[in-house]
Amino acid sequence: MHLLAILFCALWSAVLAENSDDYDLMYVNLDNEIDNGLHPTEDPTPCACGQEHSEWDKLFIMLENSQMRERMLLQATDDVLRGELQRLREELGRLAESLARPCAPGAPAEARLTSALDELLQATRDAGRRLARMEGAEAQRPEEAGRALAAVLEELRQTRADLHAVQGWAARSWLPAGCETAILFPMRSKKIFGSVHPVRPMRLESFSACIWVKATDVLNKTILFSYGTKRNPYEIQLYLSYQSIVFVVGGEENKLVAEAMVSLGRWTHLCGTWNSEEGLTSLWVNGELAATTVEMATGHIVPEGGILQIGQEKNGCCVGGGFDETLAFSGRLTGFNIWDSVLSNEEIRETGGAESCHIRGNIVGWGVTEIQPHGGAQYVS
């Protein structure tokens, strides 16, 4: 619409110019509108600036100016668009070339990757379907699963019971760790015992005594070892009273008891310690403190010259006399040691450890001190 109005005005001005001689066409210097970079070398022709323009003249001048501006604007826009289009074509061409070069050889790899992904997807779907079928089957058979689980648990219980049985058999049949021999007391008899001959005198102001015991039968008083003199047959005693352990120093009135610590048919490691200065007395069972007391036989000194025996108590001075069948031990003894000092807690634990029978006392040392069996007692391995 705007273009039609411009054309109409242009035709109308041409008709008026032909029929009228009164109007002189005036050309206006447009250098002030658009600077084309050309500057005149001569002075411009002076115009009749003082002449008044009619309304039509002003209209024509405005039309000419607007047409020129429009043509120049269209030309500039066309130039800009052409340049931009050319630049875009060049960039697209370069991009196409760069993409074409690496993609051409990579097409087979891309095809292989696509195929592998398809296979993986299919395998995943198949696995999901199989899992769903398994879950469905498992949901349909809860009772069967429960029975299978119960059978496994029962088998585990039986295995545990078998293991306990084997451990019990080993405890009954084997010697303690590190011990190669033991003395067997086959029955209770006043003739069955073992006589011990210390390597040093038994004059003691403190001592520690340890022994491994496996009893087959226990009464109210079953002697493990006993040391006594003619004056006092009960200087030192360690004996069993059913499942309890009794430790005596200086007489039967001085005793320490550890309740319910022994099981028949099983090896048990026992230690007793005592010192005269404080009367501190302790009983240890399998490396653990079972009982302790103070002021027991304080100031007492164990005299030398007595008789030391295992498996029996001698309450007389003469050979062959003073034995009591009810006091006799039946079972096995090993690892009997006596020290003339109080062992530390760690040392006591070591005497019942893997090398227990290789740790020897300085008064009585198992394996080096003479221990003579009597009346049917014998060394076994």
UniProtKB/Swiss-Prot annotation:
Gene Ontology biological process terms in this record: extracellular matrix organization; host-mediated suppression of symbiont invasion; inflammatory response; innate immune response; negative regulation by host of viral glycoprotein metabolic process; negative regulation by host of viral process; negative regulation of glycoprotein metabolic process; opsonization
Origin superkingdom: Eukaryota
Signal peptide: 1-17
Disulphide bridges: 179-357, 210-271
SMART domains according to UniProt: LamGL, PTX
Positions annotated as glycosylated: 220
GO CC annotation, single: extracellular region
Induction trigger: By IL1B/interleukin-1 beta and TNF.
Protein name in the entry: Pentraxin-related protein PTX3
Organism: Homo sapiens
Taxonomic lineage from the root: Eukaryota, Metazoa, Chordata, Craniata, Vertebrata
Gene it is expressed from: PTX3
